[in-house]
Amino acid sequence: MTAPELRAPAGHPQEPPARSSPAQALSSYHHFPTSDQERWYQETGSLCSRFLEAGQYGLHQQYQFMFFFMHHLIPALGPYPQKWRSTISRSGLPIEFSLNFQKGSHRLLRIGFEPVNFLSGSSQDPFNRIPIADLLAQLARLQLRGFDTQCFQQLLTRFQLSLDEVRQLPPDDQPLKSQGAFGFDFNPDGAILVKGYVFPYLKAKAAGVPVATLIAESVRAIDADRNQFMHAFSLINDYMQESTGYNEYTFLSCDLVEMSRQRVKIYGAHTEVTWAKIAEMWTLGGRLIEEPEIMEGLARLKQIWSLLQIGEGSRAFKGGFDYGKASATDQIPSPIIWNYEISPGSSFPVPKFYLPVHGENDLRVARSLAQFWDSLGWSEHACAYPDMLQQLYPDLDVSRTSRLQSWISYSYTAKKGVYMSVYFHSQSTYLWEED
């Protein structure tokens, strides 16, 4: 197939649409109880609405999801301007929008989210424990389809700091303080799938045990009744022990569904951003090279890696944030992030890589993605994406920005083929100077 001609989108403010967006319409009939909520909605509401439109949701679903966003997420963003720096985004923003792309499939909006309140980071709650429990209880009252907290509650119990441990750890010595977070998948049928994330490093440090030990014991505990994860997990654990893959950036996630449908993911970050290291991690140090699915996925990953032209080398990243002029220059380049997904009864994990494009020219990244998608036969996504990126940020010129897209995630299975997501800067204000 011939690659589509990719022109530079217009980089100037566009005329407002003739009809109100769902974000505008809903806010016309809603009184925000605090100025903080009103300001957060100004920063994120219209942007969320544009992501829903880019995700090709029907108008009914757009209103439904915007209502959820307005009433359950906006109140949990905490004080404005933000004081708490969240682990979930490069700028420390406690919210992150992403769009998922597959061949012939509806684009799907996901929101990564760490709830925050006015106590977050204070002496009363230096590691932001309280809002996690509060939002979890609130979600349980909504009667979301298939919602089950059992696995996530077990992980929180094992990984969250106790009050005594909170008192032991000096918060100023910890660059990454988050204890937990959520992910919300907005499905085309109107269902919301919730994911939970836990960050074990602080617990391991307070308890005086290695991160690897804490994670292995926790996976065994949640799998004790069903024994559906341990075979694949043992492959991951052996490789990560061998390669020093466990570190302060290692974290876990699970779906908030009942245990028979549960998936567990082990995440990590590495500052060696090279193709050789990616290939090693993708194959678990060679343990999976006999699996055709793994090797086919690696070959296609090499294609997008080459197109993105990410500079290879060791990054100086130490857990810092990039939130404007005050950011340390050596903390702007991101590490590479990966996860290994374990499904019930799987013989090996499915790897996923998050290629770091924070700091790369946004239009060039968009064109590289479009070129790759066109090579896969994803003509609809390929033709639409560069203009879509500009429409998401109508007040910016995406040919002059370099922080709107933070990560490009990639995974591959024989059943579904290539599966990709783009993670975005998730507030209207652009915190950096344009190039």
Curated annotation (Swiss-Prot):
Q: Name one Pfam family in it.
A: Trp_DMAT
A GO molecular function term, named singly, is:
prenyltransferase activity
Give the E.C. number(s): 2.5.1.109
**What ranges does the record give for the region Disordered, renumbered to this chain?**
1-28
Q: Which GO terms describe its biological process?
A: alkaloid metabolic process
Q: Which UniProt keywords apply?
A: Alkaloid metabolism, Prenyltransferase, Transferase
How is this protein used?
Notoamides have been shown to exhibit antitumoral activities. Notoamides A-C show moderate cytotoxicity against HeLa and L1210 cells with IC(50) values in the range of 22-52 mg/ml, but the IC(50) value of notoamide D is greater than 100 mg/ml. Moreover, notoamide C induces G2/M-cell cycle arrest at a concentration of 6.3 mg/ml.
Instruction: Describe which pathway this protein belongs to, using the record's wording.
Output: Alkaloid biosynthesis
Reaction(s) catalysed by this chain, per the record, are: brevianamide F + dimethylallyl diphosphate = deoxybrevianamide E + diphosphate
Record-annotated site: Required for regioselectivity? 112
Q: Report residues binding brevianamide F.
A: 96
> Which family would the database say this protein is a member of?
Belongs to the tryptophan dimethylallyltransferase family.
What this protein is called in its record is Deoxybrevianamide E synthase
- Phylogenetic classification of the source organism: Eukaryota, Fungi, Dikarya, Ascomycota, Pezizomycotina
Give the gene symbol: brePT
